[in-house]
């Protein structure tokens, strides 16, 4: 027999190295074979539900870190809620219509114009479904648990039918209408765009000041005066029909070297500087309010028509001249104010952004090229007062990255103005994690214009509208519901395969079509109407889900996207928000906070992390960032995350190794009989558990990440597990002291594995499979630890002890530096009271102080001679008495021999004698 054979060293087959890239797919295969997703639901059937509704990612392209951040956060929530006993189904979804898929096929060489529309749409559908299969596999590889065998997909007939019915309800309530209005138009996509499809980039544009001669001053302005306007879109001047001034602002007629100009008085200095006027040359001749200027007539600078001076409240003094160039065909404010004055809506561009015949001399020119032609013309006729170039933030198409324009075209609209207040009220009834989230969506709804829902494309859900022979619109609810039923049965391709009369209910007649002829709308719906209908197409149609959802969680760009379109359609049809709680996350940047781009070489993708480090490293990283803002990732950050993972894994492994011979049924010590140090740790565990559960409830994963590290490092590694080695390895196997510690260690191991399960989904499952005597086949089928209020008095007492222990460790470190001792077991510590703390009285109730301090001997005295003064007592460290026990390495003055083993202390003699 040798000394080592007498020790109870940790034993476990749980590997030290994670090997996650290889291990995780095995665990996921096991989950699939167990049908874990449905088992979890079955366990919680009949319980209170918690519904997180998945915002559908677009079915095109590989996953980026934003996808991973989003889906992993959702998985934290659903796994946690499920372990809290909630019935929490998670149905992932995909958004499948729209321009990017059309473009992807065009890039592959598909010629859309050379085939029937329905054939092209079938190719789009095939492409979308292929993309979904790729993304689905990648989401599952991240450990996301959901109903991936039956996701919701916006191109499915049942979804499209639900969307059409929702449209029908909005139409029935007078919320859908057709109008010629200026909308964001993308010449590069040849389609209208919603606000959510716009992003801003810098653009270089001409900045011009133009003079409009007064034609009829109405007795207010001199007939030889000129109004000055400023614009950065010279190409819109052929559509100018008015000049707008603010009714309440003051304007002046200024004489500058014999020329008379009308300018806003607050802006005259800026205009003078721009146009190079000397101050002494400027003379104010007349003053008037904008209201007094109403109906003055000016001459268009190069077209034979009047530009009327009108009033509008949108005019500001932020820039320009206070007199605004007004073209109702090319601006929303212009259009609205133009309606009041019955101004014509001129928009002489085609879908490609090229001037039509209506554009006169500019016919055939691309709008951007027309800028030069217009300025040249103004220069020739003397109307151009100044031309320079500026760089400014300008709207671009989010898909093509090309500039967009405002263009008046016949479009379909969903009325925001009619439901705006109802939506704002619904926002007030919604809960938010952060106040700025509420402010953001509130302001967006408050300030947004009417929603243009039509698109001039083919890959999307058709607008279920018909026209009679005389042009009347047919938008009856019954007709729309009939179309919905056709879509549900045959899919939306039926719209393109059949004639209008075959899509209408049998025997349908209309006074506007005496010959029984009808035509159908050719536009499709905005993709935001698709995804914005998911509360109807998913929450209300799937039996396991319910409306409204408990939570919507997406990137912060969705305040103007999915959050916005969803609450609009839900309030319009159901009178309430589709979500009770709204949560958003930021974007993923590189390690320096820069946007990731291939050109910078700073792109990290989920697939790379999973293959190199494992999904649990990606998941742990998600828990380590403040996701409410933009977050950072880099190889260095992931290396730090992997280091934290290793520490967690090794701590769990150590605990596994030390409970291998423990059966809670037969070996557990009742709480009342536990050693006080073990009771302290049990109560620290309770305190820790309560805090972690609270953080999960509040979606505060960064706090969990930090507190787990703190508990592992401070409570376990630096104290309890270190202290425990002298008990777990050395004491008799069945001794009360050892079983007392194992009871608590087992509890810590089980509870910590559960608490980590939503985040480290694979590792927790692996640990669970090695914990002896657990009942559930998966940690994800277990319940979260119950929150038990800790014993505050006990915690307070031991918190003081831990501070005293810190002082002892400082004294030991000093003794080590002074070569008094080497290892701490070579020490004898003498502690006494001082003025700041009565250590002698405080320590009288503590047992096994030498083990708690990891030294060989401790003496507590009223006063210590020659001790170093610390806050928690005077402490002296000397070399321990006696010699080292060869088994436990503690020093003793009573070494002896048992069973052929020499140099054993009395404790070890007793243990070895019984072997």
Curated annotation (Swiss-Prot):
One of its GO terms (biological process) is isoleucyl-tRNA aminoacylation. A motif ('HIGH' region) lies at residues 57-67. Keywords: Aminoacyl-tRNA synthetase, ATP-binding, Cytoplasm, Ligase, Metal-binding, Nucleotide-binding, Protein biosynthesis, Zinc. It is an enzyme of class 6 (ligase). Its cofactor is Zn(2+). CDD domains: Anticodon_Ia_Ile_BEm, IleRS_core. ATP binds at residue 598. SUPFAM superfamilies: Anticodon-binding domain of a subclass of class I aminoacyl-tRNA synthetases, Nucleotidylyl transferase, ValRS/IleRS/LeuRS editing domain. Transmembrane segments: none annotated. Binds 1 zinc ion per subunit. It is found in: Cytoplasm. Its main location: cytoplasm. A motif ('KMSKS' region) lies at residues 595-599. Its EC number is 6.1.1.5. Coiled coil: none annotated. One of its GO terms (molecular function) is aminoacyl-tRNA deacylase activity. It catalyses: tRNA(Ile) + L-isoleucine + ATP = L-isoleucyl-tRNA(Ile) + AMP + diphosphate. Catalyzes the attachment of isoleucine to tRNA(Ile). As IleRS can inadvertently accommodate and process structurally similar amino acids such as valine, to avoid such errors it has two additional distinct tRNA(Ile)-dependent editing activities. One activity is designated as 'pretransfer' editing and involves the hydrolysis of activated Val-AMP. The other activity is designated 'posttransfer' editing and involves deacylation of mischarged Val-tRNA(Ile). IleRS has two distinct active sites: one for aminoacylation and one for editing. The misactivated valine is translocated from the active site to the editing site, which sterically excludes the correctly activated isoleucine. The single editing site contains two valyl binding pockets, one specific for each substrate (Val-AMP or Val-tRNA(Ile)). Monomer. Belongs to the class-I aminoacyl-tRNA synthetase family. IleS type 1 subfamily. This is Isoleucine--tRNA ligase. It comes from Staphylococcus carnosus (strain TM300). The gene is ileS.
């Amino acid at each position: 027999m040798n000394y080592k054979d007498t020790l109870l060293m940790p034993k476990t087959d749980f590997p030290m190295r994670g090997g996650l890239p290889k291990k995780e797919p095995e665990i996921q295969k096991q989950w699939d074979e167990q049908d874990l997703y449905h088992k979890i639901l079955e366990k919680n059937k009949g319980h209170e539900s918690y519904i997180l509704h998945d915002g559908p990612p677009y079915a095109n392209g590989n996953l980026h870190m934003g996808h991973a951040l989003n889906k992993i956060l959702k998985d934290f929530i659903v796994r946690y809620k499920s372990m809290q006993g909630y019935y929490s189904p998670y149905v992932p979804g995909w958004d499948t219509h729209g321009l990017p898929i059309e473009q992807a096929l065009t890039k592959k060489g598909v010629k859309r114009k050379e085939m029937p529309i329905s054939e092209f749409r079938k190719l789009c559908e095939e492409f979308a479904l292929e993309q979904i299969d790729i993304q689905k596999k990648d989401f599952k590889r991240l450990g996301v648990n959901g109903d991936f065998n039956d996701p919701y997909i916006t191109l499915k007939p049942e979804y499209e039918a639900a969307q059409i019915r929702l449209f029908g309800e909005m139409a029935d309530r007078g919320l859908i209408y057709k109008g010629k209005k200026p909308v964001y138009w993308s010449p590069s996509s040849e389609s209208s765009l919603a606000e959510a499809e716009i992003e801003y980039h810098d653009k270089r544009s001409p900045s011009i000041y133009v003079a409009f001669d007064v034609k009829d001053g109405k007795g207010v302005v001199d007939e030889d005066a000129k109004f000055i306007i400023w614009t950065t879109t010279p190409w819109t001047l052929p559509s100018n029909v008015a000049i707008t001034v603010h009714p309440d602002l003051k304007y002046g007629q200024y004489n500058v070297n014999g020329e008379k100009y009308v300018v806003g008085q607050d802006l005259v200095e800026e205009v003078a500087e721009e146009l190079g006027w000397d101050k002494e040359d400027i003379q104010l001749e007349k003053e008037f309010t904008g209201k007094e200027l109403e109906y003055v007539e000016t001459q268009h600078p190069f077209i034979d028509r009047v530009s009327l001076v009108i009033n509008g409240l949108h005019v500001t003094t932020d820039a320009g001249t206070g007199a605004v160039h007004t073209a109702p065909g090319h601006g929303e404010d212009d259009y609205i104010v133009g309606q009041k004055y019955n101004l014509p809506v001129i928009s002489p561009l085609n879908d490609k952004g090229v001037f039509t015949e209506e554009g006169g001399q500019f016919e055939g020119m691309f709008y951007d090229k027309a800028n030069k032609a217009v300025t040249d013309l103004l220069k020739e006729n003397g109307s151009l007062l100044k031309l320079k170039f500026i760089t400014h933030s300008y709207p671009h198409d989010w898909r093509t990255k090309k500039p967009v324009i405002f263009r008046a075209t016949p479009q379909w609209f969903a009325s925001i103005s009619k439901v705006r207040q109802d939506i704002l009220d619904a926002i007030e009834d919604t809960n938010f994690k952060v106040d700025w989230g509420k402010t953001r969506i509130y302001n967006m709804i408050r300030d947004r214009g009417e929603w243009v829902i039509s698109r001039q494309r083919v890959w999307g859900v058709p607008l279920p509208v018909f026209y009679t022979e005389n042009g009347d619109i047919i938008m009856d609810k019954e007709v729309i519901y009939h179309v919905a039923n056709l879509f549900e049965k045959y899919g939306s391709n039926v719209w393109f395969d059949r004639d209008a009369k075959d899509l209408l209910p049998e025997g349908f007649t209309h006074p506007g079509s005496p010959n029984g002829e009808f035509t159908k709308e050719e536009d499709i719906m905005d993709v935001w109407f698709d995804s914005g209908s998911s509360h109807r197409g998913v929450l209300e149609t799937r039996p396991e889900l319910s409306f409204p959802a408990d939570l919507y969680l997406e990137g912060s760009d969705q305040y103007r996207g999915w959050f916005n379109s969803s609450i609009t359609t839900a309030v319009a049809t159901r009178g309430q928000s589709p979500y009770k709680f709204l949560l958003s996350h930021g974007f993923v940047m590189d390690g320096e906070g820069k946007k990731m781009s291939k050109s910078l070489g700073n792109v990290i993708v989920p697939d790379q992390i999973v293959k190199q480090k494992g999904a649990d490293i990606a998941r742990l990283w998600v828990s380590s960032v403040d996701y409410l803002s933009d977050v950072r990732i880099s190889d260095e950050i992931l290396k730090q995350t992997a280091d934290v993972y290793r520490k967690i894994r090794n701590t769990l492994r150590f605990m596994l190794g030390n409970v291998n011979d423990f059966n809670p049924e037969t070996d557990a010590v009742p709480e009342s009989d536990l050693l006080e140090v073990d009771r302290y740790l049990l109560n620290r565990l309770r305190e820790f558990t309560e805090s972690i559960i609270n953080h999960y409830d509040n979606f505060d994963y960064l706090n969990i990440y930090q507190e787990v590290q703190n508990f592992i490092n401070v409570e376990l590694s630096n104290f309890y597990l270190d202290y425990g080695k002298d008990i777990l390895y050395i004491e008799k196997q069945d001794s009360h002291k050892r079983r007392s510690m194992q009871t608590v260690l087992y509890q810590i191991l089980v509870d910590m594995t559960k608490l980590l399960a939503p985040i480290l989904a694979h590792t927790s499952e692996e640990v669970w499979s090695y914990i002896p005597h657990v009942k559930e086949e998966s940690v994800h089928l277990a319940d979260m630890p119950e929150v038990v209020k800790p014993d505050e008095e006990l915690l307070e007492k031991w918190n003081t002890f831990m501070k005293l222990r810190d002082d002892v460790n400082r004294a030991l470190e000093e003794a080590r530096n002074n070569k008094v001792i080497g290892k701490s077991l070579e020490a004898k510590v003498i502690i006494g009271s001082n003025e700041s703390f009565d250590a002698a009285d405080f320590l009288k109730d503590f047992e096994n102080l030498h083990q708690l301090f990891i030294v060989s001997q401790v003496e507590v005295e009223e006063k210590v001679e020659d001790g170093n003064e610390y806050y928690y007592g005077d402490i002296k460290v000397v070399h321990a008495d006696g010699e080292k026990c060869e088994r436990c390495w503690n020093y003793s003055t009573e070494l002896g021999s048992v069973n052929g083993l020499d140099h054993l202390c009395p404790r070890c003699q007793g243990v070895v004698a019984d072997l």
